[in-house]
């Protein structure tokens, strides 16, 4: 069988495309967590700017949902500039966001009646550019809409954070559907570590990196965001004792 003759024009075009894609990849800025164990699992060493990232609670309850919102707020807090937060449910507790490092003076809240309008406002804010981050709360994120948001983020270089919120159990199944997001996280509340004195320790979360472009999934046991939006690896997660207990109880 005769071998196909290479077309020099097509070969040159391929080389140019590969060169441009490589340059774009190298120029992509990231927002690191500042924790080597997490950053080394993320392409480029952090969450990519110019992309959208999804966050959801590990269950359908309000506690895990609040943890996901605070996790995203901590990410937004570590950016520079104004943060636009789009929502349809007026139940956001601003002091809690401040506790995660996102001061109210930095946030512009956009409240819409319908979820479709929330996502439209998110897209407009992403296209605007010059913002630290754009956050949107949504139950569903259709592929077509996620692509529009991703293209808007790519065009401006802004960080897009989508918090998936469920009102009922059946809605949580939508989180398994594919989207154009660069990463997908699931956050669950864990018991805080015992203190040597009576009291409640720093909140802890199980942060599951379910999906990441050009990377592998991973689980992290972290202590909740501090006043600067920074996480910290839990001490028993670092020495493996928590994973040991999980294995024993799940066996």
Cite the ranges covered by each PLM segment.
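Phosphate-binding/switch region of NTP-binding enzymes
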Residues: 167-236
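Solvent-exposed alpha-helices and their adjacent loops that cap or buttress functional pockets
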Residues: 47-48, 126-128, 154, 177, ...
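Detector for small/aliphatic-rich hydrophobic stretches
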Residues: 1-85, 99, 104, 211-215, ...
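Conserved nucleotide-cofactor-binding alpha/beta core module
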Residues: 80-132, 136-147, 151-156, 165
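Conserved beta-strand scaffold positions in the cores of enzyme catalytic domains, especially
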Residues: 52-54, 109, 184
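Generic structural hydrophobic/aromatic packing signal, biased to beta-strands
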Residues: 38, 55, 72, 122, ...
């Amino acid at each position: 069988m005769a071998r196909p003759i290479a077309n020099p024009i097509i070969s040159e075009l391929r080389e140019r495309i590969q060169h441009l894609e490589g340059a774009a990849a190298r120029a992509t800025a990231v927002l690191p967590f500042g924790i080597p164990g997490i950053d080394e699992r993320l392409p480029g060493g952090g969450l990519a700017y110019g992309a959208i990232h999804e966050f959801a609670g590990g269950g359908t309850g309000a506690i895990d949902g609040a943890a996901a919102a605070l996790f995203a707020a901590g990410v937004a807090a570590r950016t520079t500039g104004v943060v636009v937060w789009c929502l349809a449910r007026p139940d956001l507790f601003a002091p809690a966001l401040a506790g995660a490092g996102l001061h109210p003076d930095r946030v512009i809240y956009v409240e819409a009646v319908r979820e479709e309008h929330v996502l439209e406002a998110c897209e407009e804010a992403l296209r605007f550019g010059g913002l630290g981050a754009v956050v949107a709360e949504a139950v569903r994120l259709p592929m077509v809409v996620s692509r529009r948001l991703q293209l808007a983020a790519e065009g401006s270089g802004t960080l897009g954070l989508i918090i998936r919120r469920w009102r009922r159990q059946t809605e949580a199944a939508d989180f398994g559907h594919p989207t154009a997001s660069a990463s997908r996280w699931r956050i669950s509340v864990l018991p805080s570590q015992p203190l040597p004195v009576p009291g409640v320790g720093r909140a802890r979360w199980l942060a599951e990196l379910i999906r990441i472009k050009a990377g592998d999934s991973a689980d992290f046991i972290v202590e909740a965001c501090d006043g600067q939006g920074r996480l910290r690896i839990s001490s028993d997660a670092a020495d493996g004792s928590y994973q040991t207990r999980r294995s024993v109880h799940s066996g």
